[in-house]
Amino acid sequence: MAREFSLENTRNIGIMAHIDAGKTTATERILYYTGRIHKIGETHEGASQMDWMEQEQERGITITSAATTAQWKGHRVNIIDTPGHVDFTVEVERSLRVLDGAVAVLDAQSGVEPQTETVWRQATTYGVPRIVFVNKMDKIGADFLYSVGTIHDRLQANAHPIQLPIGAEDEFNGIIDLVEECAYMYGNDLGTDIQRVEIPEEHKELAEEYRGKLIEAVAELDEEMMMKYLEGEEITVEELKAGIRKATTSVEFFPVICGSAFKNKGVQILLDAVIDYLPSPLDVPAIKGTLPDTDEEVERKSSDEEPFAALAFKIMTDPYVGKLTFFRVYSGVLNSGSYVKNSTKGKRERVGRILQMHANSREEISTVYAGDIAAAVGLKDTTTGDTLCDEKSLVILESMEFPEPVISVAIEPKSKADQDKMGTALSKLSEEDPTFRAHTDQETGQTIIAGMGELHLDIIVDRMRREFKVEANVGAPQVAYRETFRAAAKVEGKFARQSGGRGQFGHVWIEFEPNEEGKGFEFENKIVGGVVPREYIPAVGAGLEDALKNGVLAGYPLVDIKAALVDGSYHDVDSSEMAFKIAASMALKAAVSKCSPVILEPMMKVEVVIPEEYMGDIMGDVTSRRGRVEGMEARGNAQVVRAMVPLSEMFGYATSLRSNTQGRGTFSMVFDHYEEVPKSVSEEIIKKNKGE
């Protein structure tokens, strides 16, 4: 099967946004206009094409990023719909890794919201070019220029409108195209009656002003255009488009467009903008990787002629075909039935079938080419972030980093039958989602599951019930506290058991000191002159790593510390790896009195949106939860409070906010960083954990 669309005519894009900005609806309309769907499904009726897991249809939010292929004006557009709910940021992170461009959807009433900031930051990390689509222009309180302002203020992004709306709220009935200097008027809400007309007289002045600003902004990034602009020469539509494209693909400029996906206004123009301004796989830098044996850096260009290299970015369990591995092909060609090497794990894999995915239907294809996104059936050992490549030309592409879970709950199966199935369910679910962990607590024997938030874990338990038919009781959520040292000290650990027969002897002096936040545990060997033989040194490191897992104050993992083995002694006969492991863990316990250990807790960035009259109550409530208010602003006729609050104080906040505001307040929160717990709280945590 020959390549259907050239690389220049391929776009891999993500659609990203805050929850409820109308992202799934926008994707839905794109699929409708590109001829993939015959009837439009509304999210609020629970019939959307992209939201195909049962929970998504019930809750009206998108949880797993479904990858869909659509066609528009001779181009193939692969779309990944990403969830906007904060608990699912990992889904966004992994889809951004394999995209070439993205559409950020904003709500015209709210502009940039906290989750938008998180997703925007992630996209900046991966250098993803973006177009901003200001959606819901038909909504009460919709304000296009206010929304553009929030992009400047909150994201510090160089964003400029390339369109202006004609009217707003229920008067929104057209769009001015500043690039082509024309307008599109909508005769109805079905998107079937669109007329391209001259810009209406009453909007001409504003359109000229904003077109001038647009040309100036683009010219600043393009010397040739700047010269023409300064010399007063006219810049043609083609030159302006080329300038916008160049500045957008180099992530220096973000075009802003507007519309209402729900009312079918502006979606076709959004598709045109995706093709005009977002990059093809040829416009983004070639992907870099390393050779497995030498760690030498190599690159793979977007070309069918290069050796095959792809990145697995999502694993899903499908009721009909089993395990599906979604992957992005960076270079080369892959045929179904062929063998590839998983270079990350060093295993050989056979690709059984290759499927091109529509939101929840699929089409089998025999070949995938560079720049494509598809799903493979039959891969056994591949997990998220693994590289698949040609067996004769190995390469390891840069993998993805995932955040550690911040919340955990104990779960127990309701019956013996459930117990057997629960193990399978948990291992499949953790294979699909790298931010979800399941383990057995050594002391209590309970199964503990951990994730990114209450909703995340709710959905996991829900999926266990529906997909794996496992009924389970769920305990109260627990916060993932951490411990760390605030002071440095040199401490001794000595383990000696020598009473007749073969004894045990290990003796170490270790210098502990705090490490930079986020650096984790670092172990260094500073032994001189062999006072501790070389073969026992890894045992000291391993002994410390084991002991760190259970902390020193309240049994939480110790993080961000450095340990240097500086001295010690050994016994020719009685020393063993085990003895040195124990000596190292004794040194860590001895450090408690000298290294000022503290407990750290996850802090959440919280944004509460409430009617003005509840302001006092809500501020008081935030403070009573040990929160720090970091800013307030008016948004339309509502007030927005931004605060930093410990996760432990946020349990059940949704219920309390509902009752405090008669159901009129909403909030969202996202994990921000770890911070030291106040002494009084720390004492309580230690008491509770020691069962006092």
UniProtKB/Swiss-Prot annotation:
Under Gene Ontology molecular function, one entry of this record is: translation elongation factor activity
Sorted alphabetically, the Gene Ontology cellular component annotations on this record are:
cytoplasm
Domain of life, source organism: Bacteria
Primary place of residence?
cytoplasm
Which key words are in the record?
A: Cytoplasm, Elongation factor, GTP-binding, Nucleotide-binding, Protein biosynthesis
What SMART domains does the annotation carry?
EFG_C, EFG_IV
Residues bound to GTP are 17-24, 81-85, 135-138
The cross-references to Gene3D superfamilies, in alphabetical order and at most eight, read: 3.30.230.10, 3.30.70.240, Elongation Factor G (Translational Gtpase), domain 3 (3.30.70.870), P-loop containing nucleotide triphosphate hydrolases (3.40.50.300), Translation factors (2.40.30.10)
Q: Which InterPro entries match?
A: EFG_II, EFG_III, EFG_III/V, EFG_IV, EFG_V, EFG_V-like, EFTu-like_2, G_TR_CS
Report the residue ranges that make up the tr-type G domain in this protein.
8-282
Residue intervals passing through the bilayer: none
Please list the GO biological process terms of this entry: ribosome disassembly
Q: Where in the cell is it found?
A: Cytoplasm
Q: Which PANTHER family match?
A: RIBOSOME-RELEASING FACTOR 2, MITOCHONDRIAL, TRANSLATION ELONGATION FACTOR G-RELATED
Q: Please explain the role this protein plays, according to its UniProt record.
A: Catalyzes the GTP-dependent ribosomal translocation step during translation elongation. During this step, the ribosome changes from the pre-translocational (PRE) to the post-translocational (POST) state as the newly formed A-site-bound peptidyl-tRNA and P-site-bound deacylated tRNA move to the P and E sites, respectively. Catalyzes the coordinated movement of the two tRNA molecules, the mRNA and conformational changes in the ribosome.
| Family the entry assigns | Belongs to the TRAFAC class translation factor GTPase superfamily. Classic translation factor GTPase family. EF-G/EF-2 subfamily.
Q: What is this protein called?
A: Elongation factor G
Species of origin? Bacillus cereus (strain ATCC 14579 / DSM 31 / CCUG 7414 / JCM 2152 / NBRC 15305 / NCIMB 9373 / NCTC 2599 / NRRL B-3711)
Per the UniProt record, the lineage of the source organism begins with: Bacteria, Bacillati, Bacillota, Bacilli, Bacillales
